[in-house]
Amino acid sequence: MAIGTCISIITLNVNGSNASTKRHKLAEWIQKQNQYMCCLQETHFRPRTTYRLKLREWKKTVLANGNQKKAGVEILTSVKIDIKINTVTKDKGHYIMINGSIQEDIRIINVYVPNIGAPQYIKQMLTDMKGEISNTIILGNFNTCVYQWTDHAERKVIKKHKP
């Protein structure tokens, strides 16, 4: 199927998808969005988990999980898109990189950046990929603020004590 020059991808931090009710509601929501691909972060699956997000008309699923029940990323592709996956690179739950083709070569990277050290993690990831960036889509949860002055995590609360 020709997709022209556009590909629609949704990305969502699900904050865990082990509960069956949550998986079913998530599956219904994704089906209604009518997209070509879906990238999920914080799936919290373990490597040998039997839980899966089951979606009709979604043919390929690629997961990256850590040993613990935290982090985790997933890429789902719809039957509406003819993607040929050549290689998959993943780490322990923080990113998946798919090299493939949809009319031409493309790289899709779904990232869940750790809470601590996010800017350094992102910088290192981009440095490692230097020279391999053409036709690359990087998406996910970067756990960082776009503008430093909007980041409330570093503010300290000063309490005044009355004598």
Locate predicted features.
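A shared catalytic/ligand-binding motif for oxyanion handling
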Residues: 1-163
